[in-house]
Amino acid sequence: MINLTPGKIYHHTDITKAFDGQNEGGMRKSNTTNTLHLISDHTKNSPYRDVFDGDRVYYCGMGQTGHQDINGTQNKTLNESNTNGVDVYLSEVFKKTYYTFRGRAKLINKPYQEEQLDKNGDTRNVWIFPLLLIDEHQPINKSELAKTLEKRIKKNNKLTADELLEKIKSKKGSRKPGKRPTRSNYFQRDENIILYSLLRAQGICELCDKPAPFLKPDGEGFLEVH
């Protein structure tokens, strides 16, 4: 059993010491503690996009380019985690080098495949692992989720409407947006859909056909995407 408190934030050094294993990567196996530590890093502009829905996590497998292999490295470890004796844990990163520890996770359904874009922009098959978070913990700070979404929007802000539409279409098997418990419910939204909707609107509210009520600091009209 890993001696960390679910919901608490730990520095990279403390996390690495607790698991006594790899100190980088999204799926970190430790033979010493017989654990697999899954990292959902929201600070990186990576092709991985994990979906959180209440106490369930739809975790994207390992492999940034090409089709992912269910029998490759730690994908196999996670796929067999209900029978191989390896304990699975999960942490999230909202700020570099700091990990919000979520505690134990359990594979609750068979992994399935989705088509997504890899880091080179090529369509490929990825494996999605349906997980259940076992340990109780405090709800996520809603402001952290909002900041994460804003950062992803800024990273994709230079894409054209056609490029954004291609990213949206690539997620053919994607689930509905996840809903995360905060002090009020927070729906996990896709930044590409938000940006595409804003480009299409051209500063005009599609509900009332009026210009945006005010301008943001960068001079762009403020519109809320629903």
Spans of model-derived segments:
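Compact mixed alphabeta submodule
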Residues: F94-I153
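Conserved beta-strand residues within beta-sheet cores
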Residues: D87, R102-R104, I194
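Acidic, glycine-rich low-complexity segments with interspersed aromatic residues
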Residues: M1-T100
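Short, charged surface segments at domain edges that flank catalytic/cofactor-binding sites
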Residues: N156-E220
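A residue-level signal for beta-strand positions that form part of recognition/binding surfaces
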Residues: T35, I128, F222
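Generic secondary-structure microfeatures
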Residues: H42, E92-F94, N109, A201, ...
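Accessory, usually C-terminal, subdomains that scaffold auxiliary metal cofactors
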Residues: E220-H226
